[in-house]
């Protein structure tokens, strides 16, 4: 199991999608956002490598 899969499984075990959305909504500030994620075949994974939201579109549809 790769590191991204492990991170996703840890998140999935502790929070459902609505809780993750609430957490991200509270932390995203548009262009200054530090929340990063990557879409994979198993879902969206928070990451320190990829920025999933363009600076003008940090919205739930962008994140997920």
From Swiss-Prot:
It is found in: Secreted. Keywords: Secreted, Thioether bond. Residues 1-31 form a propeptide. The keyword Secreted applies. There is a cross-link at residues 33-37, 47-53 (Lanthionine (Ser-Cys)). GO terms for cellular component: extracellular region. The modification 2,3-didehydrobutyrine is found at residues 34, 41. It comes from the Bacteria. There is a cross-link at residues 44-52, 55-58, 59-62 (Beta-methyllanthionine (Thr-Cys)). Contains LL-lanthionine, DL-lanthionine, and DL-beta-methyllanthionine, when coepressed in E.coli with the flavecin synthetase FlvM2. NCBIfam families: lant_II_LchA2. Lanthionine-containing peptide that does probably not show antibacterial activity, since its analog [+2]Flvbeta.d does not show antibacterial activity against M.luteus. Also does not show antibiotic activity when tested with [Del2]Flvalpha.a, an analog of Flvalpha.a, which is encoded by the same operon than Flvbeta.d. The bactericidal activity of lantibiotics is based on depolarization of energized bacterial cytoplasmic membranes, initiated by the formation of aqueous transmembrane pores. This is Lantipeptide Flvbeta.d. It comes from Ruminococcus flavefaciens.
């Amino acid at each position: 199991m790769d590191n991204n899969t492990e991170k996703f499984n840890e998140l999935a075990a502790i929070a459902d999608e609505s809780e993750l959305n609430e957490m991200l909504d509270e932390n995203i500030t548009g262009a200054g956002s530090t929340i990063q994620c990557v879409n994979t075949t198993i879902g969206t994974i928070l990451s320190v490598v990829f920025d999933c939201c363009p600076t003008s579109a940090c919205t739930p549809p962008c994140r997920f």
